[in-house]
């Protein structure tokens, strides 16, 4: 069983605390936010585990992440910490929820986030969570064909991770995306 060192454990705690803080703010400000308030309800911790694994492997920066309403902010937090530059994905997501005019949605819709393709975060562009999975699969296919051949060590190749709930699994686009991935695997 993996036992993180103190520095890694503190980093994980920092990411979890920051992710939980957004959900707490959303719950407290719920009456001021138009439309449904999509909070993590604790499930946001999933994104932190994924991010820690990618960070430990050294492939977080290059990997693609596509979250749903529960994990999008966590993926933003992870990338913020990994890149440690002036681009604050978490703050951008919070501005969207609060309908701030300078947010990427220009104050129009708090339940979408345009992501950040420069940093490998796909948009959370509609409430039909599964619709972005085929896009992620297409981007992953391009990554496999173009970028992977340049990286000799298979353990250092970036990956694409998307998540969705059981409701989205009923959509045909999810089944087709999973079929494409399964058919693409070389045995």
Where is each model-derived feature located?
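Cofactor-/ligand-binding subdomain signature composed of acidic, glycine-rich
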Residues: 1-35
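Cofactor-binding active-site loop characterized by glycine-rich and histidine/acidic residues
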Residues: 24-187
């Amino acid at each position: 069983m993996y036992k993180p060192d103190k520095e890694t454990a503190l980093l994980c705690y920092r990411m979890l605390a920051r992710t939980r803080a957004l959900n707490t703010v959303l719950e407290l400000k719920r009456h001021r936010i138009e439309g449904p308030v999509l909070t993590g309800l604790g499930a946001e911790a999933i994104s932190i585990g994924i991010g820690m694994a990618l960070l430990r492997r050294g492939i977080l920066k290059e990997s693609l992440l596509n979250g749903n309403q529960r994990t999008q902010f966590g993926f933003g937090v992870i990338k913020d910490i990994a890149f440690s530059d002036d681009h604050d994905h978490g703050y951008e997501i919070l501005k969207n929820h609060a309908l701030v005019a300078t947010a990427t949605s220009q104050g129009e819709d708090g339940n979408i986030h345009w992501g950040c393709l420069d940093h490998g975060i796909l948009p959370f562009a509609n409430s039909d969570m599964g619709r972005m999975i085929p896009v992620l699969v297409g981007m992953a296919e391009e990554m496999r064909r173009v970028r992977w051949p340049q990286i000799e060590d298979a353990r250092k190749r970036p990956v694409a991770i998307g998540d969705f709930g059981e409701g989205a699994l009923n959509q045909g686009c999810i089944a087709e995306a999973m079929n494409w991935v399964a058919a693409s695997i070389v045995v």
